[in-house]
Amino acid sequence: MIMSDESMEFLSTILDTPSPTGMEMDAQRLWAEYIKPFTDEQQCDAYGSTWAVLKSSKKNAPTLMLDAHADEIGFSIRHIGENGFVYVERLGGSDVAIARGRRLRFFGTDGEVIGIIGNTAIHIREDLEKAPKLWELYVDFGCDSREEVEALGLRVGDLGVYCDGPLMLNNGKRLVCRALDDRLCGFILAETARNLKEKGIEPAWNIVFANTVQEEVGCIGAAMLTYRIQPDAAICLDVTHATDSPGLNTARYGDVKLGKGGCLCFGPACHPNLNARIEL
């Protein structure tokens, strides 16, 4: 698929906009602003879940909800030590095995603060193959005391994400970034609305494009919005694991190839009739 410059700029912007669970509103505003010209109405609930509706002209048309989530994994400050080192709790499934030495963006009362997750030099480190425990990770903000950290505007509970922004590989063939889970699918929803509008396609159903919050800690936003919307059918868009990289057993994890299109989820929670319609 060849994207327009406008679409690519929107994708890059929402990927680069921090949106850890509980702090989704900046990314939600960007998403709502982009999708607004292509839909009939836009709404946001008290927690930040945002949705836009493309209405069918048919009387008593059923409602289809298309859902992605706006939040991303990250960290929150759990403890500020007297020596100035900061200890964190993870939001969602942040992998501590790849955390050491990584830069983080934290968002305090005075704005953004950059820190680095500390890492002992390989020359003096024991258990080289051992992944650290979460409580062993500490963030270094270049401070020597708790007071210095607090002077930066940081406190317990403040949120942070990795610094990694969008990076194109192989002349644009591949895109690498934090928060592709699930900002990419929110982008797909917005682009779907744009394509329907620009091509003049009249939907047979009312379509609710939903970008929900707090998925990384239990699908909370999607559950609340489903009760509110009461759709006749719903399709959730999220990322999955490609298994075509070295060391992965396709017999165990399935045969999923990067760049070969979307995957359809099967299981007790997935209605077989809806899956069959999607496969058509």
Predicted regions, residues:
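N-terminal hydrophobic/helix-forming segments and targeting peptides
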Residues: 1-280
